[in-house]
Amino acid sequence: MFSGIVQGTGKISKIISKKNHITLEISAPKNFNKNLKKGASVSVNGICLTSLDNGKKNLKFDVINETLSKTNIGKARKGSLVNLERSITASTEIGGHLMSGHVHFAGKIEKIITKNTNKDIQIKSQK
C-alpha cells in the first residue's frame, strides 16, 4: 500500500526489452534505496512494481505486458523522469490516501484548468 505522496524523482537509466516484459533500471534520489529489500513494493508513477534486488546501485523492476497495456510506463524512454514512493509500513504517517498502485485501465486527459498555482485535471475513463 502507498500513501500517494511522491517521495522522490528517479531517472530511467536503462530499458531492456524481453519477450513478455521489459526490465526498467531507475536511478533514485540519495537514500531512497536505503534498506530496500528484494521483493519490496515501490510505486513508480503510481504503479506498484516489485524490486528485483536491494537497489544498491539502481532500482530494477520487471514490467509485464499486462502492466504495459494498462499504463503509460511503456512510453517512458531512457532519461525519462518518474515519480517514486516506497510502500507504507505500520509506523508510516499516512498524509495522503491509501492506494494499492494496482492499475486497472488508463484514462485520457480531457482538459487541464489552471487556477493560480493549482491545476484541475479532467480525466475521461476509457472503460
Each model region followed by its residue ranges:
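Conserved loop->alpha-helix
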Residues: 1-127
